[in-house]
Swiss-Prot record:
It is found in: Cytoplasm. GO terms for cellular component: cytosolic small ribosomal subunit. Belongs to the HPF/YfiA ribosome-associated protein family. Long HPF subfamily. SUPFAM superfamilies: Ribosome binding protein Y (YfiA homologue). This is Ribosome hibernation promotion factor. One of its GO terms (molecular function) is ribosomal small subunit binding. The lineage of its organism: Bacteria, Bacillati, Actinomycetota, Actinomycetes, Mycobacteriales. Interacts with 100S ribosomes. HAMAP family: HPF. Keywords: Cytoplasm, Translation regulation. Required for dimerization of active 70S ribosomes into 100S ribosomes in stationary phase; 100S ribosomes are translationally inactive and sometimes present during exponential growth.
Amino acid sequence: MSRLAVDSGQVLAEPKSNAEIVFKGRNVEIPDHFRIYVSQKLARLERFDRTIYLFDVELDHERNRRQRKSCQRVEITARGRGPVVRGEACADSFYAALESAVVKLESRLRRGKDRRKVHYGDKTPVSLAEATAVVPAPENGFNTRPAEAHDHDGAVVEREPGRIVRTKEHPAKPMSVDDALYQMELVGHDFFLFYDKDTERPSVVYRRHAYDYGLIRLA
């Protein structure tokens, strides 16, 4: 299990997030100073949605086979009364990945706030300058090692490619195709599985080339 190096002289004065933050590290130990830094970064995002009660922050050291180098991935999921909003990024360090993930999450939260304003009759979008200030990131980085798989006896086994490594379950709240496209954009995915309230069937919207979308329905 790897650890994060810390500069004892680093001082962070930003306020902490009011929402609960749940951290999950895959093959990396997340120290307290990094948790505090993340909390301070996320505190700036709560103004876009005051109903946010939980941030899920996941750090993962993965192997980028195309570039043949190690990749540090950070995924941040914001949960509130509205749709789930997510930002994720991959970089050569966890700090760099965090910065990119926060930028993506901020953009999607701002988009959701603008949509709510228009829906409730307030046509004035949030100012871009309001959210441009960023907190300088420490120069310290993670020292990581490739992920290892274990069998039931605890022995290390080599993980082969082409396997299902993650399974997720989501509530199937009926929604329109437009709402499904909106939620797909908020989580930053190329597809979105949903229950179509018009056809009462499971359906999938997906991103095509040239900013177009596709729709798959079960017969």
